[in-house]
Amino acid sequence: RTGKQNILIETGIGNKLEEKKKKIFEPQEKLLEDLRGAGVAPEEINIVINSHLHFDHCGWNTIYKDGAAVATFPNAEYFAPEGEWRHGRLQTERDRVSYLSPNYDPLIQSGQMRLIDGNAEITPGISVEVWPGHTRNMWAVFIRSAGKTACYISDLIPTTWHLDPVWAMAYDLFPLEVLDNRKRYYARAIPEQWLTMFTHDPNVPWAYIAQKDNKFSFKAA
């Protein structure tokens, strides 16, 4: 919340998974309930930012109504990396199961989703930058206010268990770039005391990262 806008970074896994994937991932499907608990109705979301278009990050972009996928947040403008959409269309053997077009194609066709190539300011104080590794075009989302910085680093550092630059995931398409870009991130995030948000950590949603010699640690905020 900026005081003028309600901005949602990522929409999670959604409620459109087929039964096989539901058994695997066991989604709780609580996003809308949680938003209402915070006093925000879906109609009050102004901006939605998808760091990339894997189904677990954009699943609640849309919901099914009368058999068609429509915007979950009808008054929002959605933003996503253009390169992500282009890659998803290729349906490569390596990662085609991660891209489910009902999560984004209806929004592109309706003009509600803007695809952006590269870095951009989304709204004053909130910008996106390409940080490759997990995918080629994945964004990190930066929130800057009163001289301080918070960063939703997405799947470049998905949890606090992945702080060590060499601990990549099997899902990472470019693990050597994960290594290089984590080091590049730490070179600024640690001395400048950025608050880092971890998208997949069930216990630590955000923290400050520290380094001593070659060991990395975190201090929960």
Which sequence ranges carry the predicted segments?
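Metal-dependent catalytic neighborhoods of phosphoester/phosphodiester hydrolases
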Residues: 59-68, 208-209
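Active-site metal-binding loops of divalent metal-dependent hydrolases
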Residues: 11-14, 53, 83-84, 133-135, ...
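Residue-level marker for buried hydrophobic side chains located in beta-strands
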Residues: 7-9, 49, 78, 150-152, ...
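Conserved beta-strand hairpin/beta-sheet module of binuclear metal-dependent hydrolase folds
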Residues: 1-33, 37, 140-155
